[in-house]
Regions:
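Signature of N-terminal electron-transfer/Fe-S-associated modules in redox systems
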Residues: 1-176
Length: 176
């Protein structure tokens, strides 16, 4: 049995201690926000926050998390959307949506650790977006950082010309 806190609730998993956190969350706790993408630490779709830091839940066994504090996308905020979620919507980041939860969790952890991240910190995020939403992701990070520093987000979409990055065809790769 492994005990931890998940989204503020005490949880005991009666599973093999070598069970990846991703499967404990999805199958035993019915928290399906963390996505299965690769099972090889390559995509970041399974990102959750463990003790304040972003962790790929496919790559960590529950046995190593005894007493840990886990936050999933379902527990990122209560009531109102988290500033990263608000910025994600305001910048219209989502395309296919598969990477959304992992990206949002990684960005929330990044902004908690580094309230005004530079391009190098943003580029170092391990998450991959295959849709090529990189420019919108960067704008969402900047918007969320500003909101977290100054208060509630504006929810209306500002009118602005499209950048050359947005009008270019999608590129293969991480989209960061």
């Amino acid at each position: 049995m492994t005990s931890m806190t998940v989204n503020g609730e005490a949880v005991r998993f009666h599973l093999d201690p070598q069970t990846p956190l991703l499967w404990a969350l999805r199958d035993a706790a019915n928290l399906t926000g963390a996505k299965y993408g690769c099972d090889s630490r390559d995509c970041g779709a399974c990102t959750v926050i463990v003790d304040g830091g972003a962790v790929l839940s496919c790559a960590v066994d529950i046995g190593s998390l005894e007493g840990a504090d886990i936050v999933t996308i379902e527990g990122l905020s209560s009531g109102r959307a988290h500033p990263v979620q608000q910025a994600w919507a305001a910048e219209q980041v989502s395309q296919c949506g598969y990477c959304d939860t992992g990206m949002i969790m990684a960005i929330a952890a990044l902004l908690q650790a580094s309230p005004n991240p530079g391009e190098a910190e943003i580029a170092a995020l391990p998450n991959i977006c295959r849709c090529g939403a990189g420019p919108r992701i960067r704008r969402a990070i900047q918007r969320a950082a500003l909101a977290m520093a100054s208060g509630p987000l504006r929810t209306e979409q500002p009118q602005r010309p499209r950048s050359s990055d947005e009008s270019a065809p999608a590129r293969q790769g991480s989209g960061r």
